[in-house]
Amino acid sequence: MPVNLSMTPINKAKAWGVHAVTASGVILALLALLALVDNKPQACLLWLGLALLVDGLDGTLARKYEVKEMLPHFDGSVLDLVIDYLTYVFIPAIFIYRYIPLPEHFELLAVGVILVSSLFCFCNVNMKSTDNYFVGFPAAWNVVAVYFYVLDLHPWVNLATVLVLAALTLTRMKFLHPFRVRQFMPLNIAVTFVWLISSGLLIVQQPADLPILLGLWFAASAYFVGICLWRSAREWFG
């Protein structure tokens, strides 16, 4: 990629600043883990949600400030993957083990499936399509944990969901990356923020009967499911 910015100390400092934004995710991971230790599930999910937002934005900043070209000796993608495994997979897996009902004697199996299947996702060099959709379920167990917590599903439904999503990791099904997919990007980002805000409010107010907020949350969720199925169907059926 050609370098459009000059290699000045200020531009290099900006690039390091972007890496600092990415690195802040490990502090958020620590806060989420400490919330688990302190038996504060809502705080844990909120810290993970903030980490999700940081992860969604740092890539945009990295491209804007040409971080890879400014600092070729420091691989921000490795930094990102390390933090993502903590905030998308490892801590959510512990959260699910501790707070989400699973069938008796199947708890460790479910968590093990989450951890191992996610390793494939993180090591898959073909995890992105040419139009920046994720190929296969992108190990977004932080998002899954929110659904489990808010919906309070039956233990067997939770286990089946874990197994199905883990299996989808190995498929060619497309999953939206709202900050990278160019098509419908403004709408994708708007719906993402609707989902994030409504999720945060539902987490804070659990358990609560909030039909309007739940309706908004489900509508945003339905949009994501719909666009993923639409993009996958385009490939399946030409």
UniProtKB/Swiss-Prot annotation:
One of its GO terms (molecular function) is phosphatidylcholine synthase activity. GO terms for biological process: phospholipid biosynthetic process. Its cofactor is Mn(2+). GO terms for cellular component: plasma membrane. Keywords: Cell inner membrane, Cell membrane, Lipid biosynthesis, Lipid metabolism, Manganese, Membrane, Phospholipid biosynthesis, Phospholipid metabolism, Transferase, Transmembrane, Transmembrane helix. Residues 1-16, 63-75, 126-132, 177-183, 231-238 are cytoplasmic. The chain crosses the membrane at residues 17-37, 42-62, 76-96, 105-125, 133-153, 156-176, 184-204, 210-230. The lineage of its organism: Bacteria, Pseudomonadati, Pseudomonadota, Gammaproteobacteria, Pseudomonadales. InterPro entries: CDP-OH_P_trans, CDP-OH_PTrfase_TM_dom, PcS. NCBIfam families: PhCholSynPs. It is an enzyme of class 2 (transferase). It catalyses: a CDP-1,2-diacyl-sn-glycerol + choline = a 1,2-diacyl-sn-glycero-3-phosphocholine + CMP + H(+). It is a multi-pass membrane protein. This is Phosphatidylcholine synthase. Its main location: membrane. It holds the Pfam family CDP-OH_P_transf. Its EC number is 2.7.8.24. Residues 38-41, 97-104, 154-155, 205-209 are periplasmic. Condenses choline with CDP-diglyceride to produce phosphatidylcholine and CMP. It is found in: Cell inner membrane. Belongs to the CDP-alcohol phosphatidyltransferase class-I family.
